[in-house]
Regions:
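N-terminal acidic leader/helix
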Residues: 2-35
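Acidic, low-complexity, intrinsically disordered interaction modules
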Residues: 22-77
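Short acidic DE-rich linear segments
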Residues: 78-83
């Protein structure tokens, strides 16, 4: 499975599988219709990163470049078969 390296003081390895499953569980818990998952993930990626990092006890810093976020969204959409 893909590992995305997020820049912080040092690089944090983010498992696309773990993060995708975390998002999937959040969407299921909130009863978001599956046909809107793609847009919801794209629109709320910062929210999901923040929630995931809090759960992992990692300090969240929202200063991640847009290209990296696009790569992360694409990887999540692919993992969840939303493309």
């Amino acid at each position: 499975m893909d590992i995305i390296k997020l820049p912080y003081t040092s690089y944090l390895d983010l498992s696309v599988k773990d993060f995708s499953e975390f998002i999937q569980n959040e969407l299921l818990k909130e009863k978001v219709p599956r046909d809107s998952w793609h847009d919801d993930i794209g629109d709320n990626i910062y929210y999901y990163l923040e929630r995931y990092f809090i759960k992992q006890d990692i300090k969240y810093d929202e200063h991640i470049n847009d290209e990296l976020l696009d790569l992360l969204c694409d990887s999540i959409w692919e993992y969840l078969n939303l493309l």
